[in-house]
Each structure stands twice: as C-alpha cells, then as structure tokens.
Amino acid sequence: LVMGYKYFKDKRYLDSAKRTAGYLEKELISKADYFSSTLDANCEDKEASLYAATATYYLSLVTKGEEHKHYADLTKQAAYFALSWYYLWDVPFAPGQMLGDIGLKTRGWGNVSVENNHIDVFVFEFADVLRWLSNEYNESRFSNFAEVISTSMRQLLPYEGHMCGIAKVGYYPEVVQHTSWDYGKNGKGYYNDIFAPGWTVASLWELFTPGRAETFMKK
C-alpha cells in the first residue's frame, strides 16, 4: 500500500496503509502477540513480527515529525520481538549429520514458529529494517546483527565445489532441520524433502540487494 501510494501518487493507498498499521498496533504489536502468518501453522511465529516491522518501517519512510516517530517506535518494538527468534549460538550436530559435516553455523538464522521448529532464510527486508533502526536510534546492535544474518545466510548457497547437499546450482533449501523435531523426513542435521524454491531465492535476493525500499520511497 505504501509503495502503491508512492507509485500512483494516490493518498488513498497511504490512508489504507495507516489504517492497517493501526490494526497491527492494536492487535499484534501492543500485545506482543504475533501469530498465524505462515501458511502451514496456526500459532505464534516469526513471520508475523517481520511483517509488522516491515509495514511500520515503510510508513516511517514516508512520514515526518511525531507521526514518523510513532511508526519508528512501532518498528523497533516489532523488530525486538522478531529478533527473539534468531539464534545467537551454534547448534551442535553429531558426526555424520550432513549439516554438521558441511560446517553449518546456526547463529543468525531464525526459527520459524512454535509448531515448525526448523530454521530458514525467511528474512526478505528485515536486515534493511535493522540497519535503518541502527541509524534511527543510534543503536549499533541492530546493524551488527543485520551483518550476522547477512553473512550467515550465505552458507548454503550452492556453487561448484560447495554444493551443500543440494543437487543444482541456483537452488536453496527451505526446511533446514537443526533439531530432533519430528517432521517424518530425514531428521536433525538434514534438509526435509519439503521444498519451495521460489520464496527462498526471493528472500535472499532482497537480503543481498540492500536499500531497495528506502531508495524507492525517497524518489
């Protein structure tokens, strides 16, 4: 909606975005109750807080004064919750488990939800949000962790001589199983055979082309 407002120069889109943000503030952010934003689970999850942080970040980019500060504060609040899903340490793997054998470090990866206990690269613009918050609030921890996310999520990019158990260059695993949570396929230390190749590439594309939204909003 915010991008629609900027592109079409139609304030109705901005008004709708602000009403949507009002709902997010009332029902999610103020309650710290972020849930049901994954397609396959109806529970608390990381994605809902990422969406809330990104939405209010967009509004912060196109507003000024007290309104800007309000949306920025909401962005920070949602981002702190989202960060609680990210690993600050490296999960150990047993010898013979593929992820351990290829040297995967889990720091900087986000868990998905209380129902789906695996890690993935669902990040999209969140690193940009963190860098922006770092500048907005003079808080280096945000940008420091954005760098951890950005470097860590490169680990499983397949290329010749570094295929990471992936059959073809250009693909990226979706369900990375770092716990003994039973998905019924392969187990800890391996990928699940559930695989959606589209969003993983789209998410990494956003991660590795920083500043796109902010550049667009400032045109």
Specify the residue positions occupied by each region the protein language model found.
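Glycan-recognition and catalytic cores of secretory/periplasmic carbohydrate-active enzymes
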Residues: L1-K219
